Amino acid sequence: MSNSPKSLVLISGYYGFGNLGDEAILESIIRELEKSVAKDKIVVLSNAPETHREIYGVEAVSRWKAASLLKLLPKAKLFISGGGGLFQDTKSPGSTIYYGGQIALARAFGAHPIIFAQGLGPLDSETGKVATRLAAKLSQDITVRDKASLAMLENWKIKAELTADPVWTLDETALPEGVGRQIDKLRNGNRLIVGLSLRNSHNFSEGRRAILLSVLLKTLPKDAALVLLPLQKEQDLPQLEPFLEAWKQAGRQGMVLDTKDLKRPSQWVSLMRHLDLVVAMRLHALIFALKEGIPVLGLTYDAKVEHVLRQFGQPILILPKEGGDDQLEQKWLDSASAGLQDLEKLGAQARENAESAKKLACRNFQLLAKILDIKN
């Protein structure tokens, strides 16, 4: 690293909120940056700075203290915004204003801002669209993880590169023994062990959860055991716990995974190797499984999920936005029955596509290395 006063790399995103997908993105960024940047020069803007300092040994400050950011920016050479879906206004345009404002400040202080491996949208408000467009114009480089985001930027005449989610590059770390033992207790001969990832969503009602239960009871072997995966506890457990109760009432076996010993997202990658199939709504549950060659059955609560499932040729349960539940069980039953007939084939397709996704994801880090080299 240079002795230039501008030596810091700032990383901003939805970090420190207990969302495993965002934490996996952060871990992948830190692990790549460590190859060329000293740990004390990497700073995470976090909702839980002490946690990130302890786990990764990097610097971290509260994302809510503007004074901390303003103190760091004069020393920052690179400002990474992402990845994930930061520029969206599903609840309010506040997120677009917050992250866009950071990019504007970074540019004003002479740092090199990059929108990194993001999925842009949905953007329904005029404020959200304006804030996102301005942030994109002020960013010196942009990589996006899906074609819809690229098309949006092209429509705005803003240059960007299509890459892939950085988590495709995240190598596994050792799984704590206690976590592996939890799953191994469910094993009995050739019994199928199925991971299940659900989350609260406007288009996943109690009725649709009941339909999913019915479909899995009909399509999975009678001795199949469920391992319920809370990737973000407050959003996931309200769906997972009643599902497990109903599953057990039907005479089936399963458990909610105790995740307290899982400190790093990369340990979840190792966890996937203990499963034979993953049924998931969450994007990163699907990515963790697919990158390890584990077949998946996905529920498309969001367009980004459908994009990955189609890319990897995995069976899809379409979640309509609203209404249309009359034929939903039959549609899901048809999709699951056809899709799950050959798990070995699905696993082979996963492995084949994961390699190309990893290569595409590496483009994000090649760009970072190039920027850092120029800035040195």
What is each stretch, according to the model?
Residues 1-376:
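Active-site anion-handling motifs in enzyme catalytic cores
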